[in-house]
């Protein structure tokens, strides 16, 4: 059985970090039908956001380290080898996710970002919420 290639956007990692109803993300990361991919840029964005004061008041250093350890233990690391220029995306800081999706030929980007979700897809990659993806893999 072929596995789904999935990229989990930083906003979902942060939601997992602060415990907002995404504890199931742990099981997705360890699923037999899903390979979650990570790149330096995504990890750096996670660290940058996790260190912001508005996030730090909800989490301990230990929790940040646990989430990073989950990423490193459960995800496949890859580098971005493509460049994407998109006039459809308002936040140019998210272009790396599209480039990463092209590089690994991702099946899905999981996100809560409304701008990314409005694209619905990028080349072969579907852009969906965690809940939508959960419904897809339960079928």
Name these PLM-found stretches:
Residues 73-108, 114:
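Active-site neighborhoods of divalent-metal-dependent phosphate/nucleic-acid chemistry enzymes
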Residues 9-10, 38-39, 112-113, 129:
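A secondary-structure boundary/capping signal
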């Amino acid at each position: 059985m072929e596995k789904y290639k999935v990229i989990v956007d930083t906003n979902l990692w942060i939601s997992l970090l602060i415990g907002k109803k995404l504890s199931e993300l742990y099981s997705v990361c360890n699923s037999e039908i899903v390979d979650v991919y990570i790149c330096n840029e995504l990890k750096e964005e996670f660290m940058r956001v996790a260190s912001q004061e508005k996030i730090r008041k909800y989490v301990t250093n230990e929790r940040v380290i646990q989430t990073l350890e989950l990423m490193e233990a459960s995800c496949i690391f890859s580098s971005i080898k493509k460049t994407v220029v998109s006039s459809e995306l308002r936040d140019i800081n998210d272009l790396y996710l599209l480039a990463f999706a092209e590089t690994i030929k991702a099946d899905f980007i999981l996100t809560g970002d409304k701008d990314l979700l409005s694209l619905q897809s990028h080349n072969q990659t579907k852009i969906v919420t965690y809940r939508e993806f959960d419904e897809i893999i339960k079928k």
